[in-house]
């Protein structure tokens, strides 16, 4: 069992490390826009949530792209405060709504969302767990864009395999992650 004090210290260190950065993980606006342009058509005013939003790079982009309201969910007040400031600076405060909550314990009604967006956050719950908890939140024709760490080779060197087997034991390859998404009730439209 992990030491709660050590976990809290680690989390505080990670927050301090990422404070003030535009993103708390991989990705960029160009890649995200390309993904959005390839999605199926959503309703004119889609109901959107960015889960594990950090300081909100994705939430801001989604609000601009769709001109729609975005629920930006994260547990970290510091990041949500940064997001609120950025939304004001960009004139998006009427569209971007920071929500301090556990993305794994949302109590929204079934079918409440047309688009779930989650960059670099699902692993905090475990990919399969995150998908299983989030699927009921999507409307029948809803879409989820969720990033996940994946092995791209069966022949990865021993050192990274050993590290990730300790750090994230359920990390899998792309084919297994597709199966996990399907088991959670998703039709996989593509992977990048």
Mark where each language-model region is.
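Class I SAM-dependent methyltransferase Rossmann-like catalytic core
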Residues: 14-26
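Conserved alpha-helix/loop element of class I SAM-dependent methyltransferases that forms part
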Residues: 25-44
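Class I SAM-dependent methyltransferase SAM/SAH-binding core
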Residues: 49, 55-105
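A short acidic, Gly/Pro-enriched loop at the edge of an enzyme's catalytic core
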Residues: 105-115
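A short SAM/SAH-binding and catalytic strip from SAM-dependent methyltransferases
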Residues: 115-128
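A short glycine-rich, Lys/Arg-flanked "PGG" loop and its adjoining helix->strand segment in the class I
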Residues: 129-143
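Short, glycine-/aromatic-enriched active-site segment of Class I SAM-dependent methyltransferases
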Residues: 149-168
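Substrate-binding/catalytic lobe of Class I Rossmann-like enzymes that use SAM or dcSAM, i.e.
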Residues: 166-192
């Amino acid at each position: 069992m992990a030491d709660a004090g050590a976990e809290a210290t680690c989390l505080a260190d990670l927050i301090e490390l990422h404070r003030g950065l535009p993103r708390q993980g991989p990705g960029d606006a160009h890649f995200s826009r390309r993904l959005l342009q390839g999605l199926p058509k959503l309703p004119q005013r889609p109901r959107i949530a960015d889960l594990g939003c950090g300081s909100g790079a994705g939430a801001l982009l989604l609000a601009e792209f769709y001109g729609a309201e975005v629920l930006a969910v994260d547990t970290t007040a510091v990041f949500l405060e940064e997001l609120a400031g950025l939304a004001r600076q960009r004139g998006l405060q009427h569209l971007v709504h920071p929500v301090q909550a556990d993305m794994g314990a949302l109590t929204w009604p079934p079918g409440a969302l047309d688009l779930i967006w989650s960059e670099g956050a699902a692993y905090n719950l475990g990919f399969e767990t995150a998908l299983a908890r989030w699927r009921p939140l999507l409307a029948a024709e809803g879409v989820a864009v969720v990033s996940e760490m994946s092995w791209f080779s069966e022949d990865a060197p021993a050192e990274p395999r050993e590290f990730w087997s300790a750090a994230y034991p359920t990390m899998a390859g792309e084919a297994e992650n597709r199966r996990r998404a399907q088991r959670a009730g998703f039709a996989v439209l593509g992977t990048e």
